Amino acid sequence: MWSTKELEAEVEAILSEKISKNWTIVLYNDDLNTFDWVIECLVKYCGHDTVQAEQCAWFVHTKGKYAVKFGDKYTLKPIYEALLEKGLNAALEQNKS
């Protein structure tokens, strides 16, 4: 059985993880998706303008991966899932503080 303090601590930990802005969607390079498709997905799902999406796509291509979106886990998870559904190779990662 949980004490009130233990329960409060557990709830606080869960909430801080969910609302923390320490999360990132990292997009990885692959040989399947075209620049145009990646740019289109970044504009549609991440809310980037075309220039920002083009820059992100170029960084992904040249560096192998790039953090394309930052925020809290609750906000980023549906974006991350949409990118995966569209065939992009992405990860949802918690930044180390």
Where are these regions (language model features)?
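Terminal domain-initiation and capping elements
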Residues: 1-97
